[in-house]
Design a protein with these regions (language model features):
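N-proximal low-complexity "stem/linker" segments adjacent to membrane-targeting elements
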Residues: 1-29, 241-293
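C-terminal, non-catalytic tails of nucleotide-sugar-dependent glycosyltransferases
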Residues: 1-2, 220-263, 395, 407-433, ...
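Short, acidic, metal-binding catalytic loop of nucleotide-sugar glycosyltransferases
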Residues: 27-37, 289-303
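A conserved acidic beta->alpha catalytic loop
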Residues: 44-53, 71, 309-319, 365
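Glycine-rich, basic loop-to-helix element that forms the pyrophosphate-binding segment
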Residues: 69-86, 335-352
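A recurrent flexible, glycine/aromatic-enriched loop bordering the glycosyltransferase active site
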Residues: 76, 84, 137-166, 179, ...
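Short aromatic/hydrophobic "clamp" motif used to bind/position activated sugar donors
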Residues: 91, 357
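Conserved donor NDP-sugar-binding/catalytic core segment of glycosyltransferases
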Residues: 103-138, 365-408
Length: 554
């Protein structure tokens, strides 16, 4: 007797009193999958609406197995029952009112088979959009490739998710007490052990907007966010990050406050000519105010020294003023060559005595107290190569939210209001990015030395791009944080034109990397920094429900 091989995918759906038409559409979307290697495990968590039972009664098929609980136990209990009944290689999570794209499972299978080692693929996720009450799709969410820091700050993955069944079992399945955040909790635990994590950059799920859904009103589920906060705190404890976790200023966002190890010394390296300018109605020596704003913020866990690489031609008043402001914490490195930003930074770091170096432009002023400790907290993680800060123009708009390399080299969300959370909470969360500006960037001194510092082939422009990409090539993550913030009066102190020779160097060394940003998305418009989708990517209704309940697909 031949025993049938188990299916590749077990789609798990827990049901509790959805709109019957929405449930019918959900089930139908599974039935019309172009991939045939699946089963659908449905657990009804004691729905009270008899119409829901009628839909389930009529939904039976060879691939669908409907189980009914005797009493309502909540989504974790129902999900645990569904997992126990599943036999597939991967489990796929599908909410009872959401709709799969017809090729969803086929695309997941292709992603597994196309990996360098298919047997090592443990977690997959896709892009999604929202399914409006009028049946049209809207607001696609085009996600980055794997971004662990962002997942700690909020569940950017959400839907659609497939996880290797054996790994789900290894981490203990769905944990009781995390109802409402059970998926986020599972993703965090799975990610700690996953060998390969694959992002499929296609909209393969339509997330229903309904009265009870977080997709419609994130403020409806405070208990879910509290469960998510505990999930993040538990995750950080498991991976050895000493931190507290709070619910953030925006729904679904968590604020992580990391404790520093010991009392680190941070060398603030500032190259300057001693330039002056007028900002907010006052003439200033930029480097004086840059240093004074940090001195005024003293009292954190980090000790500061100020390594100022000062042009020998600068007015003597500049150095005298720095001495009064910084006192014994000041180290002056005289510089008598033609302007070369990379050389100045390298000279400053060579003279630095700190465990960490903060690369800082002179035309900055601290905006958020505690910024340096925030950056050190991230940089003390062994796999973090560099930490970038939020930079604001003097009018309060965003100058820097991380780099974007999508055919151009740009600042993410350039010009957005500085207090806006940004699309998909981008401006409100710590997250990986391909690079950050050296106008305010912190890294461990040994890491700077490991990758050879800044390139002398890039004296004026793109030196921070090159540094970022060298760090990533060495296996480090680059993290941007909104919790460290400076004013940046860019162009007030110095504005150097782009040198074609420097463009040629970046093209020679990083041709592929500046065109393929893993933290952007191929569905987004190239050459932009605002996460605008390419034309024609969303909006069509995926199906229509007729008066008799029949689902007709578009």
């Amino acid at each position: 007797m031949t025993v049938a091989a188990p299916p590749r995918f077990s789609v798990l759906t827990t049901v509790y009193d959805p709109d019957p038409d929405h449930l019918r559409a959900c089930l139908a979307s599974a039935d019309r999958q172009t991939c045939g290697d699946w089963e659908h495990v449905v657990v009804d968590d004691a729905s009270t609406d008899s119409a829901v039972g009628d839909v389930l009664d009529r939904s039976g098929s060879e691939r669908r197995h409907v189980h009914r609980r005797g009493s309502n136990g909540g989504i974790v209990a129902a999900s645990t029952d569904a997992l126990a009944a599943a036999v597939g290689e991967f489990v796929v999570l599908l909410d009872h009112d959401d709709v799969l794209a017809p090729a969803a499972l086929e695309r997941l299978a292709d992603a597994v088979d196309g990996a360098d080692d298919p047997s090592a693929v443990d977690l997959l996720y896709t892009d999604h959009d929202l399914l409006r009450p009028d049946g049209r799709t809207a607001w696609p969410v085009y996600k980055p490739d794997w971004s662990p820091e962002r997942l700690r700050n909020h569940n950017y993955i959400t839907h659609l998710v497939a996880v290797r069944r054996s790994l789900v079992d290894d981490v203990g399945g769905f944990r009781p007490g995390f109802d409402g955040a059970q998926d986020h909790d599972l993703l965090l635990r799975v990610s700690e052990r996953a060998r390969t994590i694959v992002h499929v950059p296609e909209v393969l799920l339509h997330w229903r907007q309904s009265a009870a859904s977080v997709a419609t009103d994130t403020g409806r589920k405070p208990q879910a966010y509290e469960a998510g906060r505990r999930a993040v705190a538990d995750h950080l404890a498991r991976i050895g990050v000493d931190a507290t976790v709070e619910t953030g200023a925006h729904d679904g966002v968590y604020r992580i406050r990391r404790r520093l190890t010991g009392t680190p010394t941070v060398s603030v390296v500032i190259p300057t000519r001693g330039s002056t300018g007028r900002v907010w109605g006052r003439t200033r020596i930029f480097v004086h105010d840059a240093v004074a704003s940090l001195v005024a913020d003293a009292g954190g866990a980090s000790r500061l020294e100020f390594v100022v690489v000062l042009d020998s031609s600068a007015d003597p008043v500049v150095e005298r003023g720095l001495g009064r402001i910084a006192g014994d914490a000041l180290v002056v490195v005289p510089y008598d060559k033609a302007f070369d930003f990379s050389d100045k930074i390298n000279a400053g770091v060579a003279a630095a005595g700190g465990d960490y170096v903060l690369l800082l432009n002179d035309d900055t002023e601290l905006h958020a107290p505690g910024s340096i400790d925030e950056m050190v907290g991230l940089a003390q993680q062994a796999d973090v190569g560099m930490v970038g800060a939020e930079l604001l123009y003097e009018d309060g708009t965003l100058q820097h939210g991380g780099h974007v390399y999508n055919g151009t080299i740009s600042h993410a969300l350039l010009g957005w209001p500085g207090d806006h959370p940004g699309p998909h909470r981008l401006q409100a969360v710590e997250r990986e990015c391909s690079g950050v500006t050296a106008a305010a960037a912190l890294l461990r001194r040994d890491v700077f030395d490991e990758v050879g510092g800044m390139s002398r082939e890039l004296p004026h422009n793109y030196n921070d791009v090159d540094l970022s990409l060298k760090l990533r090539r060495a296996g480090y993550r680059i993290v941007w944080t909104p919790h460290a913030c400076w004013w940046h009066f860019e162009g007030r102190s110095f504005d150097h034109p782009i040198d074609p020779a420097e463009v040629a160097v970046i093209e020679r060394d990083w041709h592929h990397e500046i065109r393929h940003d893993p933290y952007y998305n191929s569905n987004l418009a190239p050459g932009r920094t605002d996460w605008l989708e390419r034309p024609g990517r969303s909006g069509a209704p995926p199906y229509e429900t007729l008066a008799d309940g029949t689902v007709v697909w578009g």
